[in-house]
């Protein structure tokens, strides 16, 4: 069965869901908030997206026609190729009221009939990612005018009706083709080995599906991060523009207040503020009520978006399961046909060799399909990034064009202030010129005095040279006198050493006293010696007597 026949009905069903998803919040926002004019970059991006969708659909038609040429092998495939031009039919652009949602929601190209389940799942994941980004950006977009919304709804109604009718017809044709193919497969019957190969391929497909689901999740996270960064940059640009406009208004107010008379203007402003206080309070309460209504409306819209997102995810999962089922059926049928063709050719090695060769061919085909799906996924990412960059450039250009007038007014104000400063500087310049003349006179007087001081310094220098010569002469005389003084001092010391105690009465008197004392001490020493000698003689006599007495005593 041709896989592209199943994808021909997807734009219709998804278009209806996307139309209902985008039409409901636009009506609510248009009725609740004040109408705001759309950005010029959004209006310019809409026809370019329509041209890209038509080019992608034409490319899908050409690829389908090229892929359907070698499919006339069996009657089952011929029955599945009823409408080769249907997958590539250019999808009619759906006019949605929210322009930024169309930036990232470019309709993907139709898959080729030979695409694998991994590629189909990746494309379905990218489509789901674009729808999620569309749902996020709708919340941040201002509502369009009521007249434009009514015109778009009136233009979108017949297109949605025709797409619904075409989707129902394609569903009927698909059910008929499924019944015919099931009958043919029941009549032919497949061998037990082909069933085992199908089970093995099914297990491998499930493992690859898990890997692709992780990659799709990473892709969704990257896309969400890029969307949030884009929103942050746009809000930052809006903040800068508001700040500049605030400065412009402050300059205006400053100029208006400066033109008025100081105290009177302040009194009039106070009276006006007292009169406008109740009106401002009422306006504040009214805006608070509007804010509460908008918050409630935002919560309702968010709940509705979550419900629609869950429904779209379920539909996407059902379509993915159908695509995988049809892909496995198509691979099994292709293997059976190739085995029959090789069996009719009577290859060397028999059925086992043919089976091995078919497995190698299918493995190579799976590898190429994976490479092709990876390249297509990268192509989709690059297209989305290109669209984001283009919209960002357009918004920046629009903002710069809108800010040129504000810049011009600010430059006018700055020019006026600079002119006033120039007048002040001219007055200061006149004052400085008068000061310069006075300074020149003072400088000439100072120069004359400086010349006189130079002449006086020259005279002083000559006098200083003479005084320095005299000082040098006195310095030489001083050194000579110091040398003579040192010689006299040494002579005096030598003579003092030679003369001894001559001329020193106290020392001489002390010397005489010491001599007298020494003589007295010598005489006393002699008397003591004599007394000691007498004592020793008496001691000897006593000892002799004691020895004699001991000799007479009995022993």
Curated annotation (Swiss-Prot):
GO terms for cellular component: axoneme; centrosome; ciliary basal body. Residues 305-441, 505-531 form a coiled coil. GO terms for biological process: cilium assembly. Residues 41-54, 95-105, 118-131 have a biased composition (Acidic residues). Residues 106-117 have a biased composition (Low complexity). Residues 1-202 are annotated as: Disordered. It comes from the Eukaryota. Residues 1-12, 174-202 have a biased composition (Basic and acidic residues). Keywords: Cell projection, Coiled coil, Cytoplasm, Cytoskeleton. It holds the Pfam family CCDC113_CCDC96_CC. The keyword Coiled coil applies. It is found in: Cell projection, Cilium; Cytoplasm, Cytoskeleton, Microtubule organizing center, Centrosome. Its main location: other. Belongs to the CFAP184 family. In complex with CFAP263, acts as a regulator of ciliary beating that connects radial spoke 3 (RS3) to the inner dynein arm (IDA) and the nexin-dynein regulatory complex (N-DRC). The complex is positioned parallel to N-DRC and forms a connection between the arch at the base of RS3, the IDA tail and N-DRC. Forms a complex with CFAP263; the interaction is required for functional activity in cilia. This is Cilia- and flagella-associated protein 184. It comes from Homo sapiens.
């Amino acid at each position: 069965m041709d896989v592209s026949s199943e994808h021909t009905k997807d734009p219709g069903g998804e278009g209806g869901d996307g139309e209902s998803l985008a039409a409901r919040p636009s009506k609510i926002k248009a009725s609740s908030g004040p109408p705001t004019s759309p950005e010029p970059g959004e209006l310019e991006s809409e026809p370019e997206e329509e041209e890209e969708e038509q080019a992608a659909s034409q490319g899908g038609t050409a690829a389908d026609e090229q892929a359907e040429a070698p499919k006339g092998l069996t009657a089952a495939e011929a029955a599945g190729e009823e409408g080769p031009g249907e997958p590539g039919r250019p999808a009619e652009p759906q006019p949605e009221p929210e322009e930024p949602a169309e930036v990232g929601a470019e309709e993907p190209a139709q898959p080729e009939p030979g695409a694998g389940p991994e590629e189909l799942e990746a494309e379905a994941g990218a489509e789901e990612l674009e729808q999620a980004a569309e749902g996020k950006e709708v919340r941040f977009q201002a509502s369009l005018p009521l007249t434009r919304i009514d015109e778009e709804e009136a233009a979108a109604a017949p297109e949605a009706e025709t797409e619904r009718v075409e989707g129902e017809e394609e569903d009927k044709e698909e059910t008929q083709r499924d019944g015919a193919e099931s009958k043919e497969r029941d009549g032919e019957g497949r061998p037990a080995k082909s069933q085992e190969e199908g089970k093995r391929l099914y297990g491998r497909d499930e493992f690859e599906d898990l890997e692709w689901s992780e990659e799709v999740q990473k892709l969704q996270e990257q896309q969400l991060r890029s969307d949030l960064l884009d929103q942050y940059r746009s809000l930052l640009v809006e903040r800068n523009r508001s700040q500049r406009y605030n400065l412009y208004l402050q300059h205006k107010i400053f100029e208006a207040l400066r033109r008025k008379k100081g105290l009177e203007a302040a009194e009039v402003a106070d009276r006006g503020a007292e009169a406008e206080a109740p009106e401002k309070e009422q306006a504040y309460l009214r805006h608070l009520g509007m804010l509460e209504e908008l918050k409630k409306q935002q919560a309702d819209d968010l709940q509705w978006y979550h419900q629609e997102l869950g429904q779209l995810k379920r539909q996407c999962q059902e379509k993915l399961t159908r695509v995988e089922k049809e892909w496995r059926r198509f691979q099994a049928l292709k293997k059976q046909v190739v085995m029959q063709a090789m069996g009719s050719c009577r290859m060397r090695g028999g059925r086992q060799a043919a089976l091995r060769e078919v497995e190698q061919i299918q493995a190579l085909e799976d590898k190429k399909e994976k490479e092709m799906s990876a390249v297509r996924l990268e192509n989709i990412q690059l297209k989305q990034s290109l669209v984001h960059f283009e919209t960002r450039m357009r918004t920046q250009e629009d903002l710069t064009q809108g800010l040129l007038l504000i810049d011009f007014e600010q430059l006018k104000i700055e020019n006026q202030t600079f002119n006033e400063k120039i007048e002040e500087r001219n007055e200061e310049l006149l004052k400085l010129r008068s000061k310069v003349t006075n300074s020149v006179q003072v400088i000439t007087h100072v120069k004359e005095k400086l010349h006189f001081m130079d002449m006086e310094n020259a005279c002083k220098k000559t006098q200083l040279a003479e005084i320095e010569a005299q000082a040098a002469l006195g310095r030489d005389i001083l050194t000579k006198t110091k040398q003579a003084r040192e010689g006299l001092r040494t002579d005096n010391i030598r003579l003092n050493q030679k003369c001894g105690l001559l001329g020193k009465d106290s020392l001489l008197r002390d010397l005489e006293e010491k001599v007298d004392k020494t003589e007295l001490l010598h005489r006393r020493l002699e008397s003591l010696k004599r007394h000691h000698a007498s004592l020793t003689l008496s001691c000897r006599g006593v000892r002799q007597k004691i020895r004699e007495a001991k000799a007479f005593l009995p022993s």
